[in-house]
Amino acid sequence: WRGILAEPARCWHQALHSNRSACIEDRCVWKSSDSTLTFNEVELPELSTVDAFSGVDKHAQFRERGKTYQVNTISLTDLLAKHGAPEQIDYLSIDTEGSEFEILQHLDFDKYAFRVITCEHNFTPMREKLHELLTGHGYVRRHEDLSKFDDWYVRPS
């Protein structure tokens, strides 16, 4: 596939740059660019997240002894522009362990549209906020029983 992969957790950087042909972004996707956030990298690295979101879901106990460090940020809109993404994008997967709403709330939906979005929710209260946001931009939730922790949204033609 062709695409952009954003991953601020340092433990993944070497392998991603060595093994993926996609564009790799080491900055943390966030609601704004050029900020600095504390990132919490944990023993189960797929549960690493922006430290402010370390306690928001049922995985909080795995994040209690993480290694924290500062990361620079880039907004999703700026990330797409930096890499010359088309205005119509086939697929967006957003799995940031808690900050999904913050990121999507600040996305320029007038500039970028997606045929399919999968968005992790982990059954937190953020799930309904994401639903309101995405349906407000014309997306429809589908396949609610397909994935346990992710919602699938499509944008009808």
Language model regions located:
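Phosphate/nucleotide-binding beta-alpha loop and adjacent structural elements of enzyme active sites
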Residues: 1-157
